[in-house]
């Protein structure tokens, strides 16, 4: 028998409401509808399938306050993370929502109706209290930033009725609901299951750790990685799942199973560890591995950890009896080359030689294409990582040139395009300011808002090309720092971004203007012209600065090439 669910009953709303499917689906079409965000979708999926048992909906004010203040629902059940549905006053008023109303919850991706919520209450949360009590209050914490920057001012509480399952098109066979996983364990005859939570690729140390934990408890292993929302910058779940699938045959035959969890992590450390334990209990696990700094977001800008290294272990241990799942606390394993084995650090005598590779070092080796030893990770795992993380010489990048009209941006961009094409190895795309204006932004004017929109269009195109491995050269005027920073953020999510300030002076650009556009602007024939009646904000932190008044185009291109070589994007001559 699998572990009983949290609260005693698995709240599988999909199964409960299946007999009323046609009735609920018809009603959902007649109700006002809320479009759910990606986080809402993750939360709703685990509400509907029972992963968040004993919840049957989004928390009302009593449950919310109980969880924030006392780590408990209003009925006394332990629960550590607020599961809330936020909405703006404008949306609430526009849909006419009030206590007692029924509202359809709709998937923003395909407009499918997923559930009907009967509203208990609509309330304004104390976000400051939520940030402090649940996450520790540090304004740099990703969940605190999300709370303040992306969460609407009102929460809507109430129970939901299931209309449809969420559609997934990836790894469908690995997306077990709690009921399905429990049935799977029963079919396999498993009665003791150690669950392992991860949002990272797994290597040999993780395999050793989970096998040790299972053998010590005469149990089997559930590898239960998160494939919903994790920490920004994490390796994508497609790569990670391929890693887990490659690793699975390295376990003793029949010991481990892989299941995917569509969870939106909050990176909430101690509170999140309790939540993770509840979720794994609902999925049938009897044991749960909690490691060092479990579900922590790393360090803040001062280099300080948001939580203590063992705060999460202590939190789960505190509520061990109520949780009804055994906590497996583990020490970090390290490799002993003399005996070719992994051991917990606290069991290694002083003076014994050890080896380890940090996450930073691993990323460096992947970036440079250098050797990753088999003692650290299995060849089949490394192969997957290399396919998804090619060395920089095979990665895309964007060189973004900014400067006045006639500063030399276009000449540098064209010359750089020719130089990169000569080098070969990747496609090269050129996004000149005039070309983009004609092809992508013909309807835009030159107001600050339209200029910003134009730069964001360039950034979107550049990001997609960069993601596909191209070298992108963009050369708009881009006069505003805010627009350039947003372009950097957009493109950096897909690859590496280099900002080149073409710092040719306004006087020189105007003096050498053969097209006469500056003269026309001075006469008032062109309005909103950068440098004449519209400002150019000097870049604060360019990656490189060139000046055609003081150097040749060839020299400027050479500086950019040297920068690309130094960062590993081009092979050194």
UniProtKB/Swiss-Prot annotation:
Site (Induces change in substrate recognition on ATP binding): 330
Pathway assigned in UniProt: Sulfur metabolism; hydrogen sulfide biosynthesis; sulfite from sulfate: step 1/3
Any one GO molecular-function label of the UniProt entry: sulfate adenylyltransferase (ATP) activity
Site entry: Transition state stabilizer: 203, 206
Segments for region (Catalytic): 170-394
Binding site for sulfate: 197, 199, 295
PANTHER family in alphabetical order: SULFATE ADENYLYLTRANSFERASE
Name of this chain's protein: Sulfate adenylyltransferase
Native source organism of the sequence: Coccidioides immitis (strain RS)
């Amino acid at each position: 028998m699998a572990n009983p669910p949290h609260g005693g009953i698995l709240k599988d709303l999909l199964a409960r409401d299946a007999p009323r499917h046609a009735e609920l689906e018809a009603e959902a079409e007649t109700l006002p509808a809320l479009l759910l965000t990606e986080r809402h979708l993750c939360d709703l999926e685990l509400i509907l399938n029972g992963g968040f048992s004993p919840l049957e909906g989004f928390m009302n004010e009593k449950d919310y306050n109980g969880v924030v203040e006392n780590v408990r629902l209003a009925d006394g059940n332990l629960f550590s993370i607020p599961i809330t549905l936020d909405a703006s006053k404008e949306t609430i008023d526009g849909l006419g929502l009030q206590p007692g109303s029924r509202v359809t919850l709709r998937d923003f991706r395909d407009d499918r109706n997923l559930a009907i919520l009967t509203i208990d209450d609509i309330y304004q949360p104390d976000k400051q209290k939520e940030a402090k009590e649940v996450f520790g209050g540090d304004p740099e914490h990703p969940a605190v930033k999300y709370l303040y920057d992306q969460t609407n001012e009102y929460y809507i509480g109430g129970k939901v009725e299931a209309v449809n399952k969420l559609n997934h098109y990836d790894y469908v066979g690995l997306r077990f609901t709690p009921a399905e996983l429990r049935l799977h364990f029963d079919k396999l005859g498993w009665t003791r299951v150690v669950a392992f939570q991860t949002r990272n690729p797994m290597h040999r140390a993780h395999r050793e750790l989970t096998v040790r934990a299972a053998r010590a408890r005469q149990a089997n292993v559930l590898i239960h990685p998160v494939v919903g929302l994790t920490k920004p910058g994490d390796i994508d779940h497609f790569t990670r799942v391929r890693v887990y699938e490659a690793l699975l045959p390295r376990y003793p035959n029949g010991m481990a199973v892989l299941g995917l969890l569509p969870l939106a992590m909050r990176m909430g450390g101690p509170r999140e560890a309790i939540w993770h334990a509840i979720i794994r209990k609902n999925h049938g696990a009897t044991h749960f591995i909690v490691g060092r700094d479990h579900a922590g977001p790393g360090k803040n800008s001062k280099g300080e950890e948001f939580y203590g290294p063992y705060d999460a272990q202590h939190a789960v241990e505190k509520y061990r009896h109520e949780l009804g799942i055994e906590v497996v606390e583990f020490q970090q394993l390290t490799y002993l080359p003399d005996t070719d084995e992994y051991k917990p650090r606290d069991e290694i005598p002083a003076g014994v030689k050890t080896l380890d590779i940090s996450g930073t070092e691993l990323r460096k080796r992947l970036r440079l294409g250098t050797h990753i030893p088999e003692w650290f990770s299995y060849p089949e795992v490394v192969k997957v990582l290399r396919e998804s993380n090619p060395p920089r010489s095979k990665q895309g990048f964007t060189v973004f040139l900014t400067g006045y009209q006639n500063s030399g941006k276009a000449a540098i961009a064209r010359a750089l395009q020719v130089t990169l094409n000569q080098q070969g190895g990747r496609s090269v795309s050129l996004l000149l300011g005039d070309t983009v204006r004609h092809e992508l932004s013909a309807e835009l004017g030159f107001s600050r808002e339209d200029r910003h929109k134009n730069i964001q269009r360039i950034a979107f195109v550049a990001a997609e090309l960069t993601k596909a491995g191209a070298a992108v050269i963009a050369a708009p005027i881009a006069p505003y720092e805010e627009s350039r920073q947003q372009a950097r953020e957009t493109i950096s999510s897909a690859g590496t971004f280099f900002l080149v300030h073409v710092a040719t002076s306004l006087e020189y650009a105007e003096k050498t203007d053969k097209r006469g556009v500056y003269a026309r602007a001075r006469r008032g024939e062109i309005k909103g012209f950068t440098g004449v009646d519209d400002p150019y904000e000097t870049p604060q932190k360019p990656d490189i600065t060139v000046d055609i008044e003081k150097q040749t185009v060839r020299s400027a291109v050479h500086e950019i090439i040297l920068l690309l070589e130094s960062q590993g994007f081009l092979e050194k001559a």
